[in-house]
Curated annotation (Swiss-Prot):
Role, per record: NQR complex catalyzes the reduction of ubiquinone-1 to ubiquinol by two successive reactions, coupled with the transport of Na(+) ions from the cytoplasm to the periplasm. The first step is catalyzed by NqrF, which accepts electrons from NADH and reduces ubiquinone-1 to ubisemiquinone by a one-electron transfer pathway.
Membrane topology designation: Single-pass membrane protein
Keyword Flavoprotein: yes
Keyword Membrane attached: yes
Assigned protein family: Belongs to the NqrF family.
Lineage: Bacteria, Pseudomonadati, Pseudomonadota, Gammaproteobacteria, Vibrionales
Protein known as: Na(+)-translocating NADH-quinone reductase subunit F
Length: 407
């Protein structure tokens, strides 16, 4: 009898707790449709169910806000102004938003929970962002760890981007084996040396990442990207490999790939100042886009130079492109510096890190380095070294332009 009574009491307690939870949910969790008002324009308003983050809710309604990290809160690009309904700003947002900006309603869309009616403001250019399903034309190694992905835009469509701009790529959930990658024999030495073919990328949900264009606007009908494979660091091989770069490296001719855009803010200034471009690794992409745009589309007569850092001759690419531009344009020169040339390279050009090479062979004796405009994209260590060198030369922040995720 005591056992039966105990079971009954336990059951009643469980039922009571369930009822309490259901009651609390009915009071605390919003239900029914909510309205997101945008820019005070009724035609742009979104009616949706509560739940999820503002970034994904907007994307689900065809409003694509830039987010280089795919909504992880690390890039700080998905800024919107929330006038009401966004709740309190989160600590994760304060890494990217100042207290003054927060008082004005600045928020990260990826961190704002959609719980109630909201009133937000978005830049008008966001409504020009579109989504396309593209076809892979080619996906070839340009260096040991860099592929050039070339995508065909659907017939009759165009991506109205500016040089230095970027698009976002969507990758579905996937299980990709590095052993299936198409890596030409000339590049396989390092892959075998570091046992990279053992890695696999397992992703359980769709992801989005941003990549800068390597083509310029008058290379019509295509999108061209330089994508470095993000392998685990040698000192921590158990870290998962890069999700998006693994997906992109797996793409083959004829595959479909979804992109959205265009986005961007890494644009050239409309001045007559000298332009100095500095790149490394996959940071080649926006440098190529900018330089081709200046010389081929704009027919610019501005003095400009390009300084690219690579490890060895095998890691140099687009050499013929830039040699051709230099031969055709007396106002343009370019230089490559190798940090670790191989004996078979027979290299007689510049050696060392690109910031040192640029300083020792050009800026040290430049009559006014502070008057130049510097456009750079490369690995974080390169960017930091170049910026430090420029600061020591007295270059102001407004003349240092950085693409911070192309490398």
């Amino acid at each position: 009898m005591d056992i039966i009574l105990g079971v009954v009491m336990f059951t009643l307690i469980v039922l009571a707790l369930v009822l309490v939870i259901l009651f609390a949910k009915s009071k605390l969790v919003p239900t029914g449709d909510i309205t997101i008002s945008i820019n005070g324009d009724a035609d742009k308003s979104i009616v949706t169910n509560p739940g999820g983050k503002l970034l994904s809710v907007l994307a689900g309604s065809g409003v694509f806000v830039s987010s280089a990290c795919g909504g992880g809160g690390s890039c700080g690009q998905c800024r919107v102004k929330v006038k009401s309904g966004g709740g309190d700003i989160l600590p994760t947002e304060l890494d990217h938003i100042t207290k003054g900006e927060a008082r004005e309603g600045e928020r990260l869309a990826c961190q704002v929970a959609v719980k109630t009616d909201m009133d937000i403001e978005l830049p008008e250019e966001i409504f020009g962002v579109k989504k396309w399903e593209c076809t892979v034309i080619s996906n070839d190694n340009k260096a040991t760890f860099i592929k050039e992905l070339k995508l065909q835009i659907p017939d009759g469509e165009s991506v109205p981007f500016r040089a230095g701009g970027y698009i976002q790529i969507e990758a579905p959930a996937h299980h990709i084996k590095y052993s299936d990658f198409d890596v030409p024999e000339e590049y396989r030495g390092d892959w075998d040396k570091f046992n990279l073919f053992r890695y696999e990328s397992k992703v359980d949900e769709d992801i989005i990442r941003a990549y800068s264009m390597a083509n310029y606007p008058e290379e019509f009908g295509i999108i061209m990207l330089n994508v470095r494979i993000a392998t685990p660091p040698p000192n921590n091989p158990n870290v998962p490999p890069g999700q998006m770069s693994s997906y992109i490296w797996s793409l083959k001719e004829g595959d479909k790939c979804t992109i959205s855009g265009p986005f961007g803010e890494f644009f050239a200034k409309d001045t007559d100042a000298e332009m100095v471009f500095i790149g490394g690794g996959a940071g080649m992409a926006p440098m190529r886009s900018h330089i081709f745009d200046q010389l081929k589309r704009l027919k610019s007569t501005r003095k400009m130079s390009y300084w690219y850092g690579a490890r060895s001759k095998r890691e140099m690419f687009y050499v013929e492109d830039f040699d051709g531009l230099a031969a055709e344009n007396s106002n343009f020169v370019w230089h490559c510096a190798l940090s670790d040339p191989m004996p078979e390279d027979n290299w007689d050009g510049y050696t060392g890190f690109i910031h040192n090479v640029l300083y020792e062979n050009y800026l040290k004796d430049h009559e006014a380095p502070e008057d130049c405009e510097y456009y750079m994209c490369g690995p974080p260590m390169m960017n930091a070294a170049v910026i430090g060198m420029l600061k020591n030369l007295g270059v102001e922040d407004e003349n240092i332009l950085l693409d911070d995720f192309g490398g």
